[in-house]
Amino acid sequence: CPACAQRLESRQLKMGDRKRLVCVGCGNVLYLDPKVAVGTIIAMADTRIVMVRRAIEPGYGLWVFPGGYVDRGEVVSTAAVREAREEAGIDIRLNGLVSIYSYPDRPPVIIVYAATAITADLRHDDESLEIATFSESEIPWEALAFRSTREALRDYYDGVLHPHCC
């Protein structure tokens, strides 16, 4: 227990609810909150989008758009801009929200933005094997790392955009 250092046990607090971790000493309920992640579909001046090939698990060697976890206390849109700079080496302007993706029994909630590149000098970081730009027809659909990557790209190309969110 983070409050009193006693042992936690799994208990069902209310009929029909999922089990929660509860401290046997002080009764504190430990809620296992989801992680919040951001991704950014970045269009270059020629409308090609930026993708990176992962150098880390999960999804080693597979393609994603730049993204990562939101730090505690960080504004989600700020995290999207930061991750684009870290993973692609470019500055971006957010154009709006594509959508939010979550899946049963998966901890991350993924918030995906559409963006335009402000700078054009792409460079990948140590979390990526390479960086490239793709037209819609060139995207390596069979080599995408995550379900959320596929769904967000399909939504993006279908014109899904909520422009007043950032």
Model-derived regions, located:
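Conserved Nudix-box catalytic region and its N-terminal flanking loop in Nudix hydrolases
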Residues: A43-E86
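Nudix hydrolase/Nudix homology domain
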Residues: E9, D105, H124-C166
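A short coil-to-beta-strand element that immediately follows conserved catalytic motifs
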Residues: E9-Q12, D91-V98
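Acidic, metal-coordinating catalytic segment for phosphate/diphosphate chemistry
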Residues: P2-T40
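Active-site-adjacent beta-strand/loop module that shapes the phosphate/pyrophosphate-binding cleft
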Residues: D33, Y101-R123, A152, Y157-V160
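Conserved beta-strand segments that form the floor/walls of ligand-binding pockets within enzyme
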Residues: V22, A37, V50-M51, V64, ...
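Conserved hydrophobic "DFG−1" position in protein kinase catalytic cores
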Residues: I42-A43, M51, A115, T133
